[in-house]
Amino acid sequence: MRTILLTGPGGSGRTTLAAATALTAARDGTPTLVLSTDRTDTLGAALGIQTGPNPVSVPGTPHLTAWRPDAADRFRADLTAFQERATNVLDFLGASRLDPEELTPLPGAEELALLRAVRDAALSEAYGLLVVDLPPTPQALALLALPDELRRYLRRLLPAERQAARALRPVLGRLAGVPMPADWLYDAAARWDVELAAVTAVVQDPGTVVRLVAEPGPAGTDAVRAAITGAALRGLRTDTLIANRVLPEPSIDPWLASITAQQRKALEDWPQTYALPLHQVPHLGHDPRGTDDLAALRAPAVNAATTPIEWPVTDHLADDGVLVWHIPLPGAIRDDLDLVRRGDDLVLTVGPFRRIVPLPSALRRCTVAGAALREGELRIRFAPDPDLWPQTR
């Protein structure tokens, strides 16, 4: 299954372009599912139908299905199940139960529902293409990072090796005077890890790409640069830039002429700066509604499968005595970069984005000897640690 993740600045038309992209693929004969968690059903408005917690077929387009998962229902079900499993702990604390009717979803519930829907769609194997309407770029990249981060937290808080001491838990509990983590907690952690790994597999699959939607102009240019850099930091490949709401030229109106001049400059700069395909979507003069309007947008088709982004390590030991780790970060600015070595991990910060990356095995026996940003690539030099590096005789 191919997956297209659409994001961009708020108000750029992401949901509409997600619907148009899905429509284009479906009319080409690809079984397609388009996902969104927008509470106001912007997806349904664009498609001319009502979407909801169950997938619905789009009338007149046999291969197109739309789905807007209900975060509230799933949140109530999950929290109710958690209360049932944590009965002993809640009783010990004297806590009262929350009834499903009084539960309202917490911030972030929509995003978690979207991740779960992505996993379910991939496991169903019912579709050839999954189009995901993501939140605005900063939230979208944080959302895509969430499965890996949660798995890291689970491994730190509930390491699997602790399960070997199950027989000692009752004794430890009496000594400590508090209940020890029960088997169900470790079982739940293992189940969560499997679910999160399934989402990570979809995000990191070579068939998954990011498409950025932005209006051409100064604000759009800043948003595109940040989005491409942030996506690259997560190891995600951006396959297309979509310039939305492009105005026709020329215009005799001075106000419109000024806007079109700004758009023209951005449309000239983007392909040269990022070496990515640029697809222009015309302004229809009104908000697109229904499949006819979506077809008029002429959304780009699904591109051929791309190769995944690689972070190779090159050997310069013979010449310079170092190994070099190459991390592609297109659009990155030197002043926005920061990196910190913490044990076997590298904490890499680029502007507002941060990622904790495990070091390749060879680099764990080295010390950081320097770094440089050249041609959109961060090159980190590692010198072998004499105390850890194998000695040659």
Predicted regions and their residues:
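C-terminal lobe/tail of nucleotide-utilizing enzymes
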Residues: 168, 178-179, 193-334, 343-347, ...
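Phosphate/Mg2+-binding loops and adjacent switch elements
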Residues: 87-219, 223-226
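Intrinsically disordered, low-complexity linker and terminal regions at domain boundaries
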Residues: 366-370, 375, 380
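Extreme N-terminal starter segment of soluble prokaryotic enzymes
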Residues: 1-3
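Conserved nucleotide-binding/hydrolysis micro-motifs of P-loop NTPases
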Residues: 39-42, 71-74, 136-139, 159, ...
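P-loop NTPase motor core
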Residues: 40-41, 45-102, 109
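Walker A/P-loop NTP-binding active-site region of P-loop NTPases
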Residues: 5-69, 130, 134-152
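Structural motif
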Residues: 319, 340-342, 374-376
